[in-house]
Amino acid sequence: MTYDFITVMDRRGKDALAVDVIPFEGAEVAEGFDRIPMWVADMNFATVPTIQEHIVNRVNHPAFGYFEPSEEYYNSIINWQKERNLVEGLKAEYIGYENGVLGCLAAAVQSFTAPGEAVLLHSPTYIGFTHVFEDNGRKMVLSDLVQDESGVWRMDYEDMDRKIKEHKIHFAVFCSPHNPTGRVWEWEEIEKAMEVYKNNDCVVISDEIWSDLILQGNHHIPTQSVSEDARNRTIAIYAPSKTFNLAGLIGSYHIIYNPYLRDRVRKQSGLCHYNSMNVLSMHALIGAYRPEGHVWVDELREVLTGNVEFAYQHILEHFEGVKLAKPQGTYMLYLDCEEWCKKKGITLDELIKAGIRVGVIWQDGRPFNRPWAIRMNLALPRSRVEEAFRRLTEYVFA
């Protein structure tokens, strides 16, 4: 490989929530175990060097005044979308900066719904969506994803349509790839979902922040690409932050083709929160989307695919009673621990604490709307993933 995904990086004291925080009250790591961060969705790999190079090059100039996004910024996004997602016809005017995916979601829901109105989401549900809608006084209506005979998560289109009609919904969130299940939707699935939204006149916001992190053998389909109607009713959100581990630099972008949607989202973004770009974030994106970034992401996908395959097989062979669907994208596992916990007579709280006690810092999955779930991050060097599962096998699931 061209880039290093093997070295174990020491992030302590370097502004890293993943290693500085234990995300479960009352849990502690026992003496003799170091922390293996497997919770918050960022990566324990060094990012592609061109990002640092672009930032350092800009920092070496001693003025940091007001600025506008450069032509290079927009062209970097246009070229990235064309090469990675086969997007044609994208222009700078359709692209808009956002401080984050959730900031754009907040602006969109304020633009197209009123307090007290309902919005449709799928469940399991990314916890960030929940916070946005609760904070903005909107009612969340959940359409459960269901697992087929092979355990693959599927949308229930009849349930979606019924709930949209019952609650008079005109705003829907579509997460593609889906977080936390890791499902990468196929063309026909997206097409059917968009037909439901079209028939019920819903504005759709499509969170595609994970779209670069598709495991090998799968392919991301941009929601806006499945039809002309989808192109015109969808607000799509992307970001280099998830792909290149840049969450601490802040910065994402929307793609909105429909001027009616675009004008309102941009106006509301400026009203509801400070939504101006940081100059270093701009240069980070430009550095990320260079040719070297394409190579880095392709190698990362290979590493993540291997980690997921290892973890999936290990769980099937050693953690009897723990259920999971094999993810097709993201680097997260979403474990259903109900059968195991009930068989052992322990609570999910006790299981989570047992893992943390041996240094496996995993995440309570219940806030994502499944009562026996744990979420695990596999974006670490393979040696750390293997060590985590060794500890879980020896000390927790024994």
Feature map (PLM): residue ranges:
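N-terminal small-domain helix-loop-helix segment of the aminotransferase-like
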Residues: 2-100, 107, 291, 398
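Conserved core of the PLP fold type I
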Residues: 60, 64-195, 212-213, 220-225, ...
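Short strand-turn motif at the edge of the Rossmann-like AdoMet-binding core
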Residues: 208-210, 239-240
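PLP-dependent aminotransferase class I/II
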Residues: 233-317, 323-327
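Conserved PLP-binding catalytic core of the aspartate aminotransferase-like
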Residues: 304-305, 318-357, 374
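PLP-dependent enzyme catalytic core of the Aspartate aminotransferase-like
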Residues: 344-346, 353-398
